[in-house]
């Protein structure tokens, strides 16, 4: 199986400016992400950025970097530009790994690529079972439900499926655990151009979940439970300190 990993990295961040270049035990965060992705067996790992500072750092540690427009409205549009600039063929599998996940397990990058290769869907992603009560009703923990074949029926910030009887009795962790979506995607490269030419859907605007556009237009997304539960990404200075503590051991 052949696949390419693309890691979008933007300098601007509301809660942590310059996040991709934040030092973690002597290396910038984006280098940690790049090195984890490079262990997944991909043919190529590309960092996509619109910032010359990130470009210089990536070149400095020997990484593959593609400069993109600063005017994209979504990360998916940025992927489409990289695919065109780098000559990635339409049937190639592309895995999108977030640039703020220095602890991402290489195994799940490979898993989502393999799942797409084995499925009839043009897109695949992963989930983990919810075992923390706080996540059940947390709108920032996106839930997903699938059909019998593992294809997504819906993604929501609400608690789906709603366990009427269990919740009525005050229970929060149910006998059939809810699934929390994690933000790693695999696509057929050609599908990304199809996707960005669709108009945003009503549902994605309501939920603020871009992946709902795929279901709205009748395409499939394969979902599997991740082999390893990834650690949380870095969104705040507090998250950064936690990651530094883990990687310093």
UniProtKB/Swiss-Prot annotation:
Pathway membership: Nucleotide-sugar biosynthesis; CMP-3-deoxy-D-manno-octulosonate biosynthesis; CMP-3-deoxy-D-manno-octulosonate from 3-deoxy-D-manno-octulosonate and CTP: step 1/1; Bacterial outer membrane biogenesis; lipopolysaccharide biosynthesis
NCBIfam families: kdsB, PRK05450.1-3, PRK05450.1-5, PRK13368.1
Protein species of origin: Aliivibrio fischeri (strain ATCC 700601 / ES114) (Vibrio fischeri)
Keywords: Cytoplasm, Lipopolysaccharide biosynthesis, Nucleotidyltransferase, Transferase
Primary location class: cytoplasm
EC number: 2.7.7.38
CC terms in the record's Gene Ontology section: cytosol
Top EC category: transferase
Record function comment: Activates KDO (a required 8-carbon sugar) for incorporation into bacterial lipopolysaccharide in Gram-negative bacteria.
Catalyses which reaction(s): 3-deoxy-alpha-D-manno-oct-2-ulosonate + CTP = CMP-3-deoxy-beta-D-manno-octulosonate + diphosphate
Subcellular location field: Cytoplasm
Gene Ontology terms: biological process: CMP-keto-3-deoxy-D-manno-octulosonic acid biosynthetic process; lipopolysaccharide biosynthetic process
Gene Ontology molecular function: 3-deoxy-manno-octulosonate cytidylyltransferase activity
Protein name: 3-deoxy-manno-octulosonate cytidylyltransferase
Homology family: Belongs to the KdsB family.
């Amino acid at each position: 199986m052949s696949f390419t990993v693309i890691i979008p990295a933007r300098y601007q961040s509301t809660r942590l400016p310059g996040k991709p270049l934040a030092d973690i035990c002597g290396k910038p965060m984006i280098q940690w992400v790049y090195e984890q992705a490079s262990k997944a067996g991909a043919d190529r790992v590309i960092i996509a950025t619109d910032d010359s500072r990130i470009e210089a750092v990536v070149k400095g540690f020997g990484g593959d970097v593609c400069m993109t427009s600063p005017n994209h409205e979504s990360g998916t549009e940025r992927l489409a530009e990289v695919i065109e600039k780098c000559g990635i063929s339409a049937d190639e599998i592309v895995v999108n790994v977030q640039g703020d996940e220095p602890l991402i397990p290489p195994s799940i990058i490979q898993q989502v690529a393999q799942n797409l290769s084995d499925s009839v869907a043009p897109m695949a992603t992963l989930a983990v079972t919810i075992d923390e009560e706080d996540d059940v009703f947390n709108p920032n923990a996106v839930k997903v439900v699938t059909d019998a074949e593992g294809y997504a029926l819906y993604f929501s910030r609400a608690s789906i499926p709603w366990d009427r009887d269990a919740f009525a009795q005050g229970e929060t962790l149910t006998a059939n655990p809810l699934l929390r979506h994690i933000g790693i995607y695999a696509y057929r490269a050609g599908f990304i151009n199809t996707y960005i030419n669709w108009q945003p859907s009503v549902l994605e605007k309501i939920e603020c979940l871009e992946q709902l556009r795929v279901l709205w237009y009748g395409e499939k997304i394969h979902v599997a439970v991740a082999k390893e539960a990834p650690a949380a990404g870095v969104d705040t200075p507090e998250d950064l300190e936690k990651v530094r503590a883990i990687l310093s051991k």
